[in-house]
């Protein structure tokens, strides 16, 4: 029985490198930061390529990647490894700027020898390929971007070692599992926090529809078609769970009840009573739904004999404080997948 609570008293993921010769030597300078130029260039099979690089500071840069499938340039935020002297693995952390602003992912992984790559723009489109252009969302081919267009560009530009893992929360947690299934072997590890990996289940479809309707996103019929369209099942991680065999997996969820972050000084609350109330009355029911989804998905993995680390909290809403906790708890699984 692999289901259980992951109780990590401390995450020993930060390594301080010092030489026994009596001093501390800083890592070699990053040539990308120094020159503003990528280490190499690559063109995906469909013509997608790196447009240009923006250096933000000594550890951070933005790759501007042209997507041939969507005919747009996508910003991809990057935190470089602590030591860039040799090729390093890559953690794809979805979605872009907002995840970096709402969690401590950059600080938490600052001392790790891993590229943290956060593409931006596909969250509201579920990071998937839509069947039809949408009046609101336009052309969405995010699965193509994440599995065929972006990886070769990232590997060449950053000089990676080709080892990847993927993490996402909420609807992006669903996408993380879908992407790993769509490209076997591309991502050696996946962490999905509070996702609903039941896209062809009526409750899962309703969850997607409500999310899009409430937040003004596109029409889900343009994504996978009407409710009985085979595309819903074709993109359902539950249906295709067997294809995750051999992938390091971390799944987490709260149960929707108020917990330790439902306080006025909780993450993202900033003393705002209305924000706290919304986190409880909206984030609670949403987390209860994803809890159902995650339990069913872990049950399915168990039936298939596929190992996974599952963390089910006895409280917690659909909110950033818990996802930051989940990131910390999932790091041993992701680190194992990345070989760091």
Q: Which role does the model predict for each range below?
A:
Residues 14-22:
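Hydrophobic core
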Residues 2-12, 25-340:
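Non-catalytic cap/lid and distal C-terminal segments of serine-dependent acyl enzymes
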């Amino acid at each position: 029985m692999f289901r259980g609570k992951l109780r990590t008293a401390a995450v020993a993921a930060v390594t301080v490198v010092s030489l026994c010769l009596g001093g501390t030597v800083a890592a070699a300078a990053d040539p990308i930061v120094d020159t503003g130029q990528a280490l190499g260039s690559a063109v995906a099979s469909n013509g997608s390529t790196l447009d240009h690089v923006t250096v933000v500071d000594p550890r951070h840069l933005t790759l501007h990647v042209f997507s041939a499938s969507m005919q747009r340039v996508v910003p991809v935020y990057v935190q470089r490894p602590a030591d860039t002297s040799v090729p390093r693995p890559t953690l794809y952390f979805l979605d872009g700027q907002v995840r970096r602003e709402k969690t401590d992912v950059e600080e938490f992984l600052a001392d790790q020898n891993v590229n943290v790559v956060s593409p931006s723009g596909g969250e509201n489109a579920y990071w998937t390929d839509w069947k039809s252009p949408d009046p609101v969302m336009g052309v969405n081919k995010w699965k193509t971007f994440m599995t065929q267009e972006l990886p070769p560009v990232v590997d060449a530009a950053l000089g990676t070692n080709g080892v990847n893992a993927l993490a996402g929360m909420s609807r992006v947690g669903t996408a993380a599992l879908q992407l790993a299934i769509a490209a076997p072997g591309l991502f050696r590890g996946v962490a999905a926090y509070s996702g609903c990996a039941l896209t062809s289940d009526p409750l899962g479809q309703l969850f997607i529809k409500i999310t899009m309707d409430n937040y003004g996103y596109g029409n889900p019929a343009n994504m996978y078609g009407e409710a009985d369209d085979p595309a819903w099942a074709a993109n359902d991680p539950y249906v295709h769970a067997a294809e995750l065999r051999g992938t390091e997996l971390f799944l987490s969820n709260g149960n929707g009840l108020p917990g330790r972050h439902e306080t006025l000084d909780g993450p993202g609350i900033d003393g705002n009573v209305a924000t706290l109330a919304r986190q409880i009355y909206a984030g609670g029911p949403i987390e209860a739904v994803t809890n159902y989804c995650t339990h069913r998905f872990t049950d399915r993995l168990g039936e298939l004999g596929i190992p996974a680390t599952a963390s089910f909290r006895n409280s917690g809403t659909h909110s950033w404080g818990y996802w930051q906790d989940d990131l910390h708890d999932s790091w041993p699984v992701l680190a194992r997948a990345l070989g760091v």
